[in-house]
Amino acid sequence: NTFINLTEDLSGGVKLELYDPFLPSSCIIDRFPVKDVNIPTNEFMVKILDAIDAYLEVGHVPYIHCWGGIGRTGTAVGCWLIRHGHATPATVIDLLDELRLGDIEAGYRPSPETPYQLEFILDWELGK
């Protein structure tokens, strides 16, 4: 019932059809625009992770997405997993791969998408 939208520009994302009008009014869309195939600053990632944690704390189910669900999404989810001790820098990529097995269209593609995104996740720390 909560969308964490990491796309830029349009509320539904560039080249992504607007979904806002089709959602029930009870849904929340929280935007944290990150340029495609890029990484946020550490401070901006902390804001993204804090929002995810705040929604989880009140019982919401956050759906984190970017345009393809691989680069920016994988970066945010990877950092969240490390933040909470569900993974370490040594195990996070294997866990992301495992979590993406159900993605029929893109599950075969590595996440995150770029070397910069991978380095960003691997530098993330527990509790950050």
Role assignments for model-derived ranges:
Residues 1-62, 84-115:
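Cysteine-based protein phosphatase catalytic domain of the PTP/DSP
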Residues 78, 94, 122-123:
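Generic alpha-helical structural context detector
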Residues 78-84:
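Walker A/P-loop NTP-binding motif
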Residues 59-78:
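A phosphate-binding catalytic loop at a beta-strand-loop-alpha-helix junction
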Residues 119-128:
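C-terminal domain-closing interface element
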Residues 7, 77, 125:
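Short, flexible helix/strand-to-coil boundary loops that buttress conserved ligand/catalytic motifs
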